[in-house]
Amino acid sequence: MKKTSEFVYYHPWISFGLTLLFLFGFQLLNIIYGFDIHDTGFHLVAYENVFNAPDSVTYNFMYYLNTLLGGAIMYIFPDMGVLGFRIVGALLVLFTLLIIFVTLRNTIPAIHLLLGSILVVAGYVNLPYSFNNGILSCCLYAISIVFLYQGLFKENKILVLLGGFIVGINIFTRIPNVLAIGLVFIVLLHKKCFQKVYNVDWKSSFYFLIGVSLGILAIWGIMVKMGHLGVFLRGLMAVFSMAGGEGSHNLIWMLKIHFAFYLSAIIPLLVFYALIHIGKCVERKKNKFIILLFYVVSVLSVALYVYETRWVYIIIWAFLALGCIICALRNRNQLGVLGIFALYMLLFEIYGSDYGINHGSFPAFLAAPIASMQLLDRKKIVYVLTFILAVCWQVIRKGNFQDSGPIYQKTEKINCLETKGIFTTKENAYAINTTLKGIKPYVSVGDTMICFPSAAMMNYLTHTRPAGGMSVPGGTETSFVLPIEGTPIVLFNKVPFSGNGWTETYKLDDKYGFDIKSFISEHNYRKVYENDYFILFVPPVS
């Protein structure tokens, strides 16, 4: 391990380049494997319609910046498909890591920047990920803090302004990112708290807020120019309506979820504490083999357990939060300020997801290298690598988000240009291929089609438009879509949720799809196609 640390110290750029290659290779395992008909489709159908039919994807305008950029990429490269947008997502993550390495390598040792990078990417459970609002939000959040931090300590107001500008535009990636404006309090008090200078930094705070305002005005101006402002405001009203509703996006529900998430981090912290003290007792034996065996077995057990129960985020989050807190308490200098910035991102970037932790390890872009620096010495780095390797093995063994099963079982392709280069299970490929073939005589490009409850990918694969402004009408609040204007085609998924078992068939609850079934009955729809997975209904011929 000593030789590795010395190589990184003397050759930081070569080491970082090799790390990026490793991380891209790791992501490649998940770029080409796994097929998701819900989340990925939700974004892709928005990119396809943001310019030519924005009203059909109104709900996506709560992620306006992401939708706009995705639409621009699809407009320039119309044949990218699912694979292309997965590559874009992976490259965006690597670009963010590059920015962090370039700007912070004089503050944080290169070995910890590299370890942090590996931990962030390897710790992301919900693979494969495509270019989406979650990734863009985390990347812009981290980049804004890096510029803000550099601006404060280089006394460069342009960088502070730029950091604020990125915060401003990032509000339109996810509306809850408005909480990032709270970074102004760190800017305001950083001298008083960490530099023992008893005054507040009004000037930097002013530049930061001006930057935020310019960012908001820039996106607002784009909306006006593109004719998107009305659609955005309607989508925003729907979001506020959902916050007061009874679904998973209810405000009180999300507050409870986040509070529960923070409480759940206490258990891993206690486990860390216990293992550290047991480890000290083992070290007194002064038997190197026993010491190594204890730590490796402990780390492997923890890694395999948390990944098996999908709580890897919590144990990583707890470790990183502890590192940021220690950094702030130990360092009454620039590094302490960076620790507070990283902790703020770790705490608040995740807010707004209905299950709190759905952005995975990406909110830890800054916290990971800081925690590595504070909690790990050179001898303990091998245990972090053991944890990372265990997680990598679990990714290969357990499969992908919404497409479970080992990667090596995903050998089939879907017969569609948009999914070229993507492999999935035999069952999934059969389900999509037979459905696309069966509905083809009844569905044309540009038609309006409801994919109930949340099979948005079917809209994208058929190049149809969602109805009522929502491509996942059963994925959040059905009241947002219904009542529906006109009589669109209805593709009814027989499985209640498009998750890991979306090709499974079982007896449905009578309440499942009650609203859409009532709509179909009321308007005398005809069933024209059915298989084990989907039913296609078309309106009566006028």
Predicted regions, residues:
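Transmembrane-helix motifs of polytopic, lipid-linked glycan transferases
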Residues: 87-109, 143, 274-277
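Transmembrane-helix signature of polytopic, membrane-embedded enzymes
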Residues: 100-123, 289
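Membrane-interface alpha helices of multi-pass inner-membrane proteins
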Residues: 124-125, 159-175, 181-186, 214, ...
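Short periplasmic/luminal acceptor-recognition loop of GT-C membrane glycosyltransferases, typified by
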Residues: 398-478, 486-498, 531-537
